[in-house]
Amino acid sequence: SGKDKIKLQKKKKASVVVAAKKAGSAKVQAKVGKKKYVCKVVVKAKTVKNGTSAGTKTTNKPADTKNATKNPSNGQNNAATQPTNNPSKDNPSKDNPANPTATPAADSDVPKKNEQDVKKLQALIQTLNQKGADISANLDDESVYHWNKEGRLTEIYWGEKKIIGAEMADFNEFTALEILDINNNNISGTFYVGDLANLKELKCYGNKIDKLVLDTNKNLQELDCHNNQISNTIRLNDSKNLERLYCSNNKITELDVSGCDKLQDVDCSNNLMSSLNVSDLPSLKSLNCSRNMLKDDNLILTGSIGLINLDCSLNGTNYDFINLNLAGFTKLESLNCSEQPEDGGTSADDTMEFDISACTGLKTLNCSYCSIETLDVSNLSNLETIDASGCNLSEITLDGAVKLSSLNINCNEITDLHIPETNEIKTLDCSESLGIETINFAVLTKLESLDVSDSYVPELDFSICPDLQVLNAMNTGFGNPDATTDNEDLPNIDIDLKSNAKLKDIDMSMVNVNVLTLPENDIVANLSASNSAVTQIVNLEKQLGLETLNIAGTGISALDLSANTNLKQVSCTESQKTGITGVDESIIYIVPDDSDDGEDGNEDGDDGEDGNEDGDVELE
């Protein structure tokens, strides 16, 4: 048809008319996540100049009347003035109405609408519009209504129509209704969904409904009622065909999905549930029950071993996630049990070991800000990402996690971080880990991002990390100090980054470094060495793509930046400004100079060791 790109609107329908050899129609539907897209295609038959349809055989050229008169024996005397193609079933023409392809009606496939449905729908539209709604009264608008072959109303799309005062009883007489979408209106009160036996999808999210009752909706496949004020128990045990349930951001205290064997996706996050039983649901793939009030070990998953994604984070002080039984959950790929308070159901005297060894298919683990002392992922050969930041970890075992590419263990108490020689780690965050004494950095040959800020680490040979792109070493003490050593007592060293040809962002603020050598190419975009011992930056003139530079509080007093034509901001102290040349003064940002205020800080009370709190300009 040439119309291979048809724009489909969100939760709406579109239609298009095309020409082809044969007439007909079709409805194309697609779902992307929770969104539904529908397009009706009407096909008209192509016609040619003589009025026949494309692909229809035409007759021979009419006989020559002159020759026919001279030779009557050919049998075409008077008939020669007419075409030889007489209209028939096998030889159609524009004058033959029996031919279905000759002049197809655009609406030939559209059935007559059910009179009762039309009458009730028109009355409901009028009533709601009188209350301030903005609902289309065009019953042929396929972005709003859909009718089946019997003329019954099967789909209503009234999302964001300013509806006030609608009740479920208003829709119960549309007994053929399969999809009802009334999202983001101002509907309040109780919603009883009982008489619509054919209803498959109900989307009433973004309203003010405080009670939702679904008793006999056995054909319901999707319920989306998130962002309401629902406070009652949601019972769906009779909805045996339910596949998707989204009821987050309500006040639900209990959820009954027992027997929903087809249920695949559940999001009941941010409610008031103290227990949740989703056991023996063989089709369940995704469960988000975060931000509830689950107590003890009242999240029951037994038998739902097809689960792929589980989020049970942020569940209050009484939730004992440590005892979460995940035995047999070999298909689980993503687990988020983060941000559980320290007294999360486990006494301080217990050994807090999180056992996930049975989850052999796990790819992503987030157990950040939980009370875990030891973490063993050696059996998880598919694990790619670990976020164990902010825990009480003293030990983590990584042997066997051969696909691990991202490791975040900042703010822990690990003293010895052993990384397997065979690893795929590209991102490592061990910042704010003052207790780390040994890290075998030599095996991190694929590292792209490293954060060792606010830590003490051994001297690093950065040449082993040729793919390094981001380096954050702010307030890091390089050397082998004990945990009581102050950065000022560490000997100054030189840092050589010339082998790191992919390094884009460097933060060497507040470090004991004298000479900082940059890569020889022009890849670095952001560089900060503020309040450090740096007196020289080698290869700075080669950084043609440099955008931000912070040398405030360093030992650098003179700097020619004429080669760095892409600079957008240079941060320095007032005393350093006079030594900076080659850039426009408009991009120079003055950081208050501590030396002007004496040992006790300035008059405004910024009396820390590093001077004004605003002295550091963070890299974007």
What are these regions (language model features)?
Residues S1-N74, T81-Q82, P87-D90, D95:
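Extracytoplasmic soluble-region selector
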Residues V28, S93-I179, N186, A197, ...:
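N-terminal capping/linker segments that flank leucine-rich repeat
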Residues G316-N318, Q340-T351, G479-P491:
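Intrinsically disordered, low-complexity Ser/Thr- and acidic-rich flexible linkers and loops
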Residues I156, L180-I182, L202-C204, Q221-C225, ...:
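Conserved hydrophobic beta-strand positions in leucine-rich repeat
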Residues A166-A169, T190-F191, L212, T233-I234, ...:
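Canonical leucine-rich repeat
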Residues L153, L177, S188, L199, ...:
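Conserved hydrophobic position(s) of the canonical leucine-rich repeat
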Residues N50, N60-K61, N67-N99, T103, ...:
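Asparagine/serine/threonine-enriched low-complexity, disordered tracts
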